[in-house]
Amino acid sequence: MASPFPPSSAVRPRDAASLLIYRHAGARVQVLMGKRRPGARFLPDVYVFPGGALDAADARFAADALARRAAAGRAHMVLEPQWLQALAARHGLHAAALLRAALREAHEESGWRWPKADLPGLDSSGVRYIGRAITPAQSPRRFHARFFAVPDERMQQDPHADGELLDLRWVDVHNPERLPIIDVTEFMLTELQRELGGQRKAWPLLSYVNDAVRVRRLPISP
């Protein structure tokens, strides 16, 4: 797979996060995706998962979540699942901030939101960590994106939301080829299948070297 981005001077990648909202349709697995607007600066007219850059509010929210857990005598656990505990042990609040960014962006872009009752302590039961990817050095807009996944029944639809993504649809993870997607998206769809099938023992980092994709499988790290 070659890089889909045009040559440009290297810029530092921004921390970002995406959320794969998935559902089971019989024996098949489907993921919610939408098309970026034609005038978007990054990947216009391409189908993506809801997601975006980490912002200062995400870090503040994560700090508040940790404070609530400290008050409850659980300061050592930023988040519940074992893999998120590992992220938190290595990077502290950064792990919680990334998950919060994924949840926030999902609401803003698709209208699907995390239950309000679960937000104060950032109860993340049911969430899976899929992997991460770093945009090629030649891209004019670069991201160090982490990908999380959650079943649709764990989310709520906001009837008043006007999502930023167009043409929201459920896409079969086994057959996304008819839509314009980039290699990172295709890769994460495959990783979701492997995760749900219990076939993974490590978490991937996808990056680009000399315009070619490189995948390393590493211990959990955000």
Predicted regions and their residues:
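N-terminal leader/linker segments that precede catalytic domains of diphosphate-processing enzymes
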Residues: 1-222
